Amino acid sequence: SGRPLHLDISDEPMKKGIITNRNKFVLGGSGSGKSFFMNHLVRQYWEQGTHVVLVDTGNSYQGLCELIRRKTKGEDGVYFTYTEEHPISFNPFYTDDYYFDVEKKDSIKTLLLTLWKTEDDKITKTESGELGSAVNAYIERIRADRNIVPCFDSFYEYLRDDYRRELEEREIRVSREDFNIDNMLITLRQYYKGGRYDFLLNSRANIDLLSKRFVVFEVDSIKENKELFPVVTIIIMEAFINKMRRLKGVRKQLIVEEAWKALSTANMAEYLRYMYKTVRKYYGEAIVVTQEVEDIISSPVVKEAIINNSDCKILLDQRKFMNRFDAIQSLLGLTDKEKAQILSINQSNDPSRKYKEVWIGLGGVQSAVYATEVSVPEYLAYTTEETEKVEVQRLAGELGGDMELAIRQLAEGKR
């Protein structure tokens, strides 16, 4: 009908019991208007006070981030781009007060297991248990001796010198088959001082996301790096989880674009489950955005950890996936009515208006197709069309970096 609608897809459905979590799963092929819709969604959440952390692989949110930075006079809108000169690093053992709750200890253990094992390696109960004990014992050590700097380096030294000796002296010996500590130390050596990734887990300045409400991590440059990509993604998620625990009564949103692939291995399933559980507990929402149907269909981890924990499903134009749609339908648990709604997207759009349609389903109870139609200035802020993006950036450069003014001027010319 073209009538603007106010749509609440987080709180009202939760109050009414339509959904049991605020997480969202977004699927749309390239060119379906996915990035555009997400920019529109994210801006509205941000304007209503939400703290947003984005993990992106394609500069989709650069324009919006820059607008927010200018609007807040540099107070907000932080854009981290991962480069070799400026890598993202953090300290998993950092706390303000030496307080490590069970969840914090678990997340450290999961991070270490991820660094140690390849995606195909099975983690045994003994390995998980021993590493958990080592983390516990190290935490007791740094609490007792405040001269030890809590970081990965001092943990590695504790593991190599003290924990290994303690293992050998035990009455009941742990066999190498059950827990090969030497193999672990060799594998983790690259993250210890002098190793090629020694910067990653020994940061002296922690990533402080607490005061910033809009933060983008652009990790495109390492998405093909099988070693770095999962670690950096976990580091960012850890920073987000720390923020969630400390910020009470405020909505927190973690949006992971294609970077979810770094987490779709069997070893990561536990971490994802933990993350989703924590998000729900602290008034947060996790949003996974993807265009890779093959990856979703073939990954049991995605189904169990991501889709089953996302009560809000958002689908854009699926014409590219017509021949795979039965698999998508079964994966997402869609009814035939919902399937018909989704396949009607963009089939009879009004040619006099510029918009793309989107299907939103809530908890398998409510669903409908909506149009994402925005003003010309808003369109120019979000566009991923290269020529339009370049035009906005060029004019902003001429106007001393004022993107908002550049957008206004270009919009006037297009009216």
Residue ranges: model-predicted function:
Residues 58, 217, 292, 319:
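Residues in the short beta-alpha loop(s) of Rossmann-like NAD(P)-binding domains
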Residues 1-81:
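Glycine-rich phosphate-binding loop of nucleotide-binding enzymes
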Residues 15, 19-29, 41, 131-168, ...:
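Charge-patterned, long linear interaction tracts outside catalytic cores
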